[in-house]
């Protein structure tokens, strides 16, 4: 199977346009102990994503140098089969050499006030009338 085919499958699984800005760097599977299960889930799929090295907020006359990553964010997404899905997202950080300030790209990945992807939070709100913090799907 070609790399492009894998990427197309990932685009169907991961939130909209995420792979336009992030590389999938690892996938881990974790069993959920029976006493921690809230429903039928048997495990968790954890996708690790690192932002591509492309700062888009450049100001004319400024130079930027890479400066590692911000602290990783844990984001909940739609379950896959009987597995919870967690995205571990690391955004890159650059230093503006003219100002010394740390800068980075901004993304709308989660719904405000939640750790859920936009699509997942919208689904939960439509289904339950609110976005639960913990439950069968989260």
Task: Name the predicted role of every residue range.
Residues 7, 22, 30, 65, ...:
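Compositionally biased, intrinsically disordered low-complexity regions enriched in proline and serine
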Residues 43-90, 95:
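N-terminal juxtadomain amphipathic helix
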Residues 75-138:
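Short, positively charged, Gly/Tyr-enriched micro-motifs
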Residues 4, 8, 36, 41-44, ...:
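Glutamate identity and glutamate-enriched acidic tracts
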Residues 22-25, 34, 66, 76, ...:
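Intrinsic-disorder/low-complexity regions
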Residues 1-55:
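N-terminal alpha-helical interaction blocks
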């Amino acid at each position: 199977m070609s790399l492009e085919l894998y990427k197309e499958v990932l685009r169907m699984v991961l939130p909209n346009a995420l792979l336009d800005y992030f590389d999938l760097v690892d996938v881990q599977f974790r069993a959920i102990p029976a006493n921690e299960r809230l429903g039928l889930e048997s495990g968790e799929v954890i996708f690790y994503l690192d932002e591509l090295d492309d700062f888009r907020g450049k100001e004319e006359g400024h130079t930027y140098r890479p400066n590692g990553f911000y602290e990783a964010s844990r984001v909940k997404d739609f379950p896959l089969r009987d597995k919870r899905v967690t995205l571990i997202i690391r955004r890159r950080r650059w230093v503006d050499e003219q100002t010394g300030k740390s800068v980075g790209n901004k993304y709308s990945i989660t719904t405000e006030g939640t750790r859920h992807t936009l699509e997942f939070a919208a689904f939960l709100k439509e289904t339950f009338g609110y976005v639960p913090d913990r439950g069968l799907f989260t």
